[in-house]
Amino acid sequence: MSNTDLEELRRGTDLVKRGFAKMQKGGVIMDVVTREQARIAEDAGAVAVMHLESVPADIRKRGGVARMADPGGLEDVIDEVSIPVMGKARIGHTAEAQILEATGADMIDESEVLTQADDRYHIDKREFTAPFVCGARNLGEALRRIDEGAAMIRTKGEAGTGDVNQAVTHQRNIQRSIRKLSGMDYEERDEWAREHGAPRELVHETAEMGRLPVVNFAAGGIATPADAALMMQLGCDGIFVGSGIFGAENPQAMGEAVVAAVNNYDDPETLKEIAKSPGKGMKGQANETLPEEEKLQDRGI
């Protein structure tokens, strides 16, 4: 076997990484801190869980530096559930991502929810076997992350607020740009790529597909079944829910309701019944009241 073949086996290929991400399509991925929360999430119907030290709402309250969670906690969650387990690394923090991969994370989120480690560069995700998910506010950001090796994109939204406004804004930004690209000729797409700092090959691929070349989930401020249904109606492939589950009055009921809403997002009668079931949601904070320095979505390039 040649050295090239061995190298290909050692690292997950783009095809394998994107294939794993596609397996989560149509599902809900829930943030968890403990193995007990992971069990609740799996029982509620989550397709995967995201392990972190604290949910985003608590990270906001606590302040200070937010880092990768203790890998021992990640191991506990992996032992507890049968669904995929993801972990968060700081933007640009290659060593944290290496630790998460070595611990057994099925996917790594290079996340703006944690304190940014590098102001200029993101992790080179092509050097990892584990697939990555990254946040984006617009199509240029999304395509730059995909070029670095991301297998999944999510809206950044404004995590920990319970306000879906920014997730909606980011998804509409991405969809609007894709529609615009699809109506351009080849030279115009090249010009768009230069203006937005996006890889031209990915720009052309996106225009021809009429969507991102990888799965695109909603995240950031999704707090209710109705929020989840809205994001699916806007063309998302699935949903990340952070503080909205375990910040709710009844996490099990809220988790089940969000999963049901994603499965029935285009059926208002069923959504009406689902919306009655989960009890009181998390206490939110409107995005427009946040000071600029507290907005997590601005982290990254």
UniProtKB/Swiss-Prot annotation:
Span list, region Disordered: 273-301
Top enzyme category: lyase
Signal peptide: none
UniProt cross-references to InterPro entries, sorted A to Z: Aldolase_TIM (IPR013785), PdxS/SNZ (IPR001852), PdxS/SNZ_N (IPR033755), RibuloseP-bd_barrel (IPR011060)
Reactions that this protein is recorded to catalyse: aldehydo-D-ribose 5-phosphate + D-glyceraldehyde 3-phosphate + L-glutamine = pyridoxal 5'-phosphate + L-glutamate + phosphate + 3 H2O + H(+)
Binding locations of D-glyceraldehyde 3-phosphate: R172
SUPFAM superfamilies on file: Ribulose-phoshate binding barrel
UniProt keyword list: Lyase, Pyridoxal phosphate, Schiff base
Catalytic residues (positions): K88 (schiff-base intermediate with d-ribose 5-phosphate)
UniProt binding sites for D-ribose 5-phosphate: D31, G160, G221, G242, S243
One Gene Ontology term from the biological process aspect of the record: pyridoxine biosynthetic process
Pathway(s) of this molecule: Cofactor biosynthesis; pyridoxal 5'-phosphate biosynthesis
Domain of life: Archaea
EC number: 4.3.3.6
CDD domains: pdxS
GO molecular function, one term: pyridoxal 5'-phosphate synthase (glutamine hydrolysing) activity
Function: Catalyzes the formation of pyridoxal 5'-phosphate from ribose 5-phosphate (RBP), glyceraldehyde 3-phosphate (G3P) and ammonia. The ammonia is provided by the PdxT subunit. Can also use ribulose 5-phosphate and dihydroxyacetone phosphate as substrates, resulting from enzyme-catalyzed isomerization of RBP and G3P, respectively.
Family of this protein: Belongs to the PdxS/SNZ family.
Quaternary structure annotation from Swiss-Prot or TrEMBL: In the presence of PdxT, forms a dodecamer of heterodimers.
Protein name as catalogued: Pyridoxal 5'-phosphate synthase subunit PdxS
Annotated gene: pdxS
